[in-house]
Amino acid sequence: MLLLWILVLVVGIAYLAHRRVAPLPALGVVAVYLLAMGAWSHAPGWLLLIFWVLIAVVAAPLLLPDLRRQYFTKPLFIWFQKVLPPMSETERDAIDAGTVWWDGELFSGRPDWDKLLAYPKVQLTEEEQAFIDGPTEELCAMVSDWEIGQAMDLPPAAWEHIKTHGFFALIIPKEYGGKGFSAYAHSQVAMKLATRSGDLASTVMVPNSLGPAELLLHYGTDEQRNHYLPRLARGDDIPCFALTGPLAGSDAGAMPDTGVICKGEWEGKQTLGLRLNWEKRYITLGPVATLLGLAFKAHDPDHLLGEEEDLGISLALIPTDTPGVEIGRRHLPLGAAFMNGPNSGKDVFIPLEYLIGGQEMLGKGWMMLMNCLSVGRSISLPAVGTGAAKFTSLVTGQYAQVREQFNVPLSAFEGIQEALARIGGNAWLMDSARMLTANAVDLGEKPSVLSAILKYHLTERGRECIGHAMDVHGGKGIIMGPNNYLGRSWQGAPIFITVEGANILSRNLMIFGQGAIRCHPFVLKEMALAGREDHDQALKEFDGLLMQHIGFAVSNAASTLVLNLGVGHFEKAPGNRLSQGYFRALNRQAAAFALLADLSMMLLGGELKRRERLSARLGDVLSHMYLASAALKRYHDLDSPDHLQPLFTWAMEESLGESERALDELLSNFPNKVLGCLLRVIVFPFGRRHTGPSDAMDAEVAAVIGRAKGDPTLEELLAGCYRPQSAEDPVGALQHAYDLLGASHPLQKKLHTALKSGQVKPAAGEHAIDAALHAGVLQPAEAQTLRDAEAARRKVIDVDDFSKEELTQAEGKVR
């Protein structure tokens, strides 16, 4: 009986903490329970004394704030100031950049699902939809990935179409002659282009991402906006932006490029300006750019502007015909044809008016870049990764039906089904995350942490989809030529892994490294107090935050235990019967994540910055919870249709499984082994619940991408994908073969039955169709239908070959 009283006490305290009941009322409830326990439980006095002492230990700091600050908070504050990792100015700007959105809810340990579901659905305007259905569709039809690769350039007609129809002006407001499209529309355009050609998508997306237009919109002077934005919108100027250098890469803090404040001659007059020296590389659109955005470090050694000498990272806009600018040569990134190359400048003099935002923004360049990068990185590269997944879903699902081995379609093999499921399931999951994040940008957010999550996970999953597609296609994907619709995508996949922050860096340093500070309810505020000079007031504020932080950590520990023991099953959750279980699973994971994140930061302090693999695993948990949230939001917005259950269930099991795997690995490698074992009991009291999609789920998703055009589940998965209809196009030829083989399936079955029964016995060298026609099993029209289907199948299966003369290396073309 006594054990039952103790069990109720422990569970009750955990539940009060889980519900985040205020400390003093919670202590009051516990005190009343202990009085009852003393009266009726026959508990020994020494045990009750221990419980009352524990209550006193907890209550004393709450009831005696002055003593708490003096003997608890003050030493902790001094320790916190010592262990706080040093932070460079560029790191501080990166952390301060952007806004916190749903990532903050996940970090809270208790996400408000009603808040997520209340966000408006993504939607295109009529004008945006017309642009996608019209000029974007037309642009896709104008290009061939193979021909682009042979010419090492887009066709002239495509360049003209891009300029004429404002593809470089998607984000430029209408008052400057641009399209003024939403972030979602921008993402839809980039994704559709990516389903046709990576080179085409890269060419269009860069001016609409981090570049002169974005920077001018946020920080440019009125004169700069009025001059440059209309020219960019019309395509009179082609922009590029130069940040990355040979030695420092994209580490702006180590940038060797300089601009020295000096006087020089400009348009016949002595003018105060900057003398620039720089060397950059990997700059997309650089070889054809007429307007160069440049990042450099500004210095004022002669104090022409003031006492400060090192002014900081600054940004300027420089016409590429300015004397001293060297630009035009090209890189060949894995043979991709989009314009990319180096540029440099030696003693290039520019007036201060060339600074983006004018002299007022001198030295504020890194802050400007970080704020703009969080928006662009939320849209462009996630759209390209999703485009790759949708395209590979389209062609691989059909190819696995068209191509046969051992007289059965490839799609019948379980090994192939596993690859098909990874492609199709990832495509729907990635699309959900892309849509949710673009929606956040349209709601006014600048989601810096979420943009890092999307950049990493959507480009990685895009590369995974291309890899699986190559495995299924086999030799068809390897032999280059006009009929290979996959090879150049495979060649170009590592490019998107590398740009805008290499993925290995994003995962190991940025996602949790930035998110732990930026999204945590208290850490950023506590760090700000640590640097304050008014020590007494800072201590007082730190004390208040510390009490909240401790309550937060205790609550998350209790929630982790309570929810994993099954209490969460009785709590209200939104959604239908299927999705409710997933909302509850994410509640469990969010509580566990918040607990482990807090403990990791407490145990390691500044060392966590160097324990990259622990940081990466915490980032993986946060990332997969976000992907799962996106899938739940999309499923809810579509009114939870039955036909989407295979894709939705796969996406949730994939995300939850990966999140649990990261938690498992984190606990196995936790810095304190004893604490790690204790935490494992709390986080996984019954072991892991989600290990990824089952074989049966994989088979269902594999079947989806092999279905005929018009199937509602397939159409939802492929929405926004360019689908050429001409049988002369290699992708169109695949669709044509799929349709003919589907229509001729009853005849194929009829022929196979006749062959098996011996009704049709082809002579040596005689085709089975001809033998069936002679035997009267097939009518002439039926025989022709089968011949047409087989010819279409053969056209798809065939690969290219070349004569020696055709392979003679032609002189490369440089625009």
State what each model feature region is.
Residues L7-Y15, A26-L35, F51-P207, E214, ...:
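Amphipathic, small/basic residue-rich leader segments at the start of a protein or domain
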